[in-house]
Amino acid sequence: MVSGAVRYYHIINGEDITSYFSFEEEFVSSYKSFLTRTPTITYIQALEETRLINISYEAFQQMLASPVLAHKIERFGRLVAEHYLCCYEDRVASFITQSPEERYLQLLQTGREILQRMPQHYIAHYLGITPVSLSRIRKRILEPVIK
């Protein structure tokens, strides 16, 4: 993605649940769907005016077959896979080891872009909670500061 912001989401019981966000200079894709050429269950929605560089599977395969580009494209693919794996591991670990409030506090430290650019209801679902729960957590955190 050259510019903009997107969210990844799933539809569960008729409700869309945000699972991830991507911003400038990040790879945007259902990577599994791209590699396996199968339909994805993940929706990707642009939330701002977004500019993308589109690479089709066929073009990707042609670059891999090119003696000049193959090693660079293989490295690119490895880096993308590593990025996805690290993000996935961090996300799973946060749901296993942290409370919703701890996940929000972590987001305050490391996810400023998400907090500044995304609507609260998407952030709530990203944290695995309802918008009402997020509001309560934010109030608890801000109360000591206000008093």
Language model: regions and residue ranges:
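Hydrophobic/aromatic residues within well-ordered alpha-helical segments
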Residues: 73, 77-80, 84, 100
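Short, Lys/Arg-enriched N-terminal segment that forms or immediately precedes the first helix
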Residues: 84-93
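Phosphate-/nucleic-acid-contacting segments
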Residues: 98-147
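Short beta-strand segments in beta-sandwich/barrel cores
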Residues: 5-9, 51-52
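Cyclic-nucleotide recognition modules
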Residues: 18-78
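Glycine- and acidic-residue-biased ligand/ion/polar-headgroup-sensing regions
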Residues: 1-7, 24-25
